[in-house]
Structure formats: structure tokens, C-alpha cells
Amino acid sequence: MFKEGIPFDASSFKGWQGIEHSDMILTPDLVRYFIDPFSADVSVVVFCDVYDVYKNQPYEKCPRSIAKKALQHLKDSGLGDVAYFGAENEFFIFDSIKIKDASNSQYYEVDSEEGEWNRDRSFENGVNFGHRPGKQGGYMPVPPTDTMMDIRTEIVKVLNQVGLETFVVHHEVAQAQGEVGVKFGDLVEAADNVQKLKYVVKMVAHLNGKTATFMPKPLYGDNGSGMHTHVSVWKNNENLFSGETYKGLSGFALHFLGGVLHHARGLAAFTNASTNSYKRLIPGYEAPSILTYSANNRSASVRIPYGISKNSARFEFRFPDSSSNPYLAFAAILMAGMDGVKNKIDPGEAMDINLFKLTLDEIREKGIKQMPHTLRRSLEEMLADKQYLKEGHVFSEEFIQAYQSLKFNAEVFPWESKPHPFEFITTYSC
């Protein structure tokens, strides 16, 4: 099995193969596996790549294979030996969720004991203890306001069991929201770790009678969940982002940043991959939409974290979220950064101000670009700016077309055509 791979039906995955050419092979990665901590019997979870039996090569629509090609392209270009990524994934843990999607009815309802909407509710034995973080009031409270500390502790223990080292875990700003960050790794390893993290968080919540989601914006009027992504590039065991320019960065780093900012509007098709993503990217909720950079400034879309050593020089890209496929998101970020280095793209001046306070007129006057406001727009921007993705045959034209078609048909068109409950408030009595 490990030598010959595992055959499967690729036509069962949307956007992949037609039924007439559906045979593909899963090739296990024998250095990337873990014992499933939730299985009743001993089970091993193995990360796999997809092999194309028709072209006798890694499948060009396999996200993990694309991530591997991006890392190899970095090496082949001579620009670096390895790109390190580290993700901070935010999530919500709710007590329950109800969803209805019918022709005559559209609604959802999530619930959490922490929710401010439950201030007047009687819980078990008629008791309501009253300790709640409130909207945007949940950053690092202690119990009893923080009702999820024990669940997060259990998450960390299980993550350690499956080989992930955590460096940050706490209640986040929103009600019922948490965050766990795991140690960085190379591009592919970091993407594997995101998948592993999401599995563990969802399963621990499930076994505690809760439901976890990495959806970017499940609550109106409260902060959303991002996937802040830390990046650095190394060569000959040296951090190429360390230098003598702004905040200890190198020219290489600033050009890398210039590439990401230059391509960010199309890059969002991979880093912010859902229609819901763009409800998070609005001012006032610590989710940056203005494409600029700054040191220690969480209103900028790119933050330069404080570091005491050259090895810690890195960027924190704050716009991505966990609706993205991490293999595609990380690969696209690397490709954009490499394009910036090759073409010496200037990122412009840093903006060390609270960008959330800028008016639209001020943003226009300063010539600052913003993130797209919809998934449709990000896909259109990606299609108009895709050549950098295709360098080194990392993202193929066939993959790009399949990806945009899937996103339009499965998400954009249905979202645009469905009546929304809020429209009945604004329009029903017209």
C-alpha cells in the first residue's frame, strides 16, 4: 500500500476529475503521520499527496502538491532554502447551531452560555450566573467569565499528543472565541499542522458536547476569526528577513512584502476563500482591510512583530482566515513574495498610525489599496493577476480555472442569488 499508493475516485471531489478519467492515487507521506487520539481502535492518520496516473506526475490540482512545488520553486530560484510559516488560528466554540436553507426560509442561530443575548435566560436548575465577556470584551478574561478554559487546556494536551507544540492559547476578543497557535514549520509542514489543529479543536469540542467552527464571521457586531500567518525565508541557516532597514528588516524582506501587498487583492482568493471572509474584513474589529504595513500595529494588514534577535525577523500577515486551504494560501503568499524580490517591488512607507480611524477620502488621498469587499471581486482580481502564481509551474492554468469555477458556482452565485433575512427588513414593505 505504501509503495504503490491507494487508488481512489477523484471525480467525487468537486473541481477535480470527470467520471471518465476518475482514477487517481494517494501516495502516503511516511514522515507525516500521527496516531488518532479520538479513534476507539488504534488508527494512524497519514498525510498524502495525489498522483496523476494519466500524466505520471503529482496531480496539479492537489493543494499539498502545489505547496511542495512552491517550496521547491524557492530552492530552484536560488532565493532561499526554506520558507517558514506559522499560523495563529482563531475559532469559536458554541453550545449549538441551527441552520435552515430552504426556498421560503433562510436562517441560522448559534448559541453560547457566554453570549450577551443570554443575560436573561435561565439555564440548568433555573440558574444564570451572569458572568459574560460581552461584545468585544473577551480578550483573556479569567473564569468564570471565560467558560472555555478547560476545553482549551484539553485541546493543548491533545495537540501535544499528536506532535504539535503550542506557544499561545487564550480566550479571544469575541464571545465564545478562542485561539491556539502552534510552532512554525516549513510551508508544507505548517499547512499540515493547520489541518491537524482544526481536526483536534473540532473533535475536542464535539466530545465535550460543543461545536467548534473556524468560520471567519459567525457573529454580527463582534470580532471574527482570522488565521494570522507569520512568514520568514532562510538561506544557509540565515534569516534573509533580518537587516538594517525599517525595524531591523532587510531589503530582501521589504521586497518580499512589496510583492505580497502588490498581489494581495488577487491573493485574497486563496487567503480569504469564502463569501463570509469579507464580512470579517471591515474596520473596527481588529481585521485589517487596508493594504499597508507597520511595526506592532494591529490595524495594518501586515504587522512586524517585536523581536529581540535576528532570527525572529518576520512578517505577520493579518488578513488570512481559516476558510482558506492552508496549502494554497501559504503557497500563494510565497509566490507573491518571491515575485516582489525578483522585481524589487517597493512596499511603500510604513504607516504607524491607527488605520481604522482613516476616512475613505483619506485612504484615497494617500493612494492606499484596500482588500476586496467580496469573494467575487477577489476571484476577478486573481484571474487578472495570475502570472506570478504560474512561475515554475507551481499553480497551473488548469488548476486556476478549476478553482475559480468551483468558487463561483458553489459559493458566489448561490450567495448572490439567495434572499437574505435582512433584505426583508429593508425591502419587504417597499
Predicted feature locations:
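Short beta-strand elements
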Residues: 105-121, 125-127, 227-235, 291-293, ...
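Glycine-rich tight-turn/loop motif centered on a GG-T
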Residues: 107-112, 137-145, 183-192, 238-247
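Conserved structured core elements
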Residues: 64, 85, 149, 153, ...
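Catalytic-core signal marking the mid-to-C-terminal active-site face
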Residues: 200-204, 210-213, 234-430
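Accessory "access/gating" subregions that flank catalytic or transport cores
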Residues: 136-167, 180-187, 198-214, 262
